[in-house]
Amino acid sequence: MLDYFWLWSEMIVRWVHVIAGVAWIGSSFYFIALDLSLKPGKELPKEANGQAWQVHGGGFYNMVKYLVAPKKMPEELTWFKWEAYSTWISGMALMSLVYYGSASLYMIDLEVLDITQLQAVFLSLGGIVTVSYTHLRAHETSSY
């Protein structure tokens, strides 16, 4: 019975990860298309970089892009961050279920290195943290 629970958990988390990834890619494509369609306008504030008029579902939208925050921020602001967050969180959950849950099957080759499952998991997490830290430090020192 526990095997079925494990398999269903993997399948559900895998689909959540796929759907979150598709949402993230979709919103990224939307903003690429939005940036490419921006046009300058005479009636725009000086802080604005451009505007794009769009139509969807019978409604018209006037999108204005600011390169810096406008002087007066709206009370409610829509953040497009949860697509990326949910992809990352579901990916970590999937990695934990598939690889860390079955570390002896996927992560350990006794002919190469005789380690326990816990050691394999900590080596993996240590590698992820090291690569992430190195990547962040490289971007802090580089100039864009």
Language model region names:
Residues 112-119:
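Interfacial loop-to-helix junctions that mark the boundaries of transmembrane helices
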Residues 1-24:
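Long, highly hydrophobic alpha-helical transmembrane signal-anchor segments
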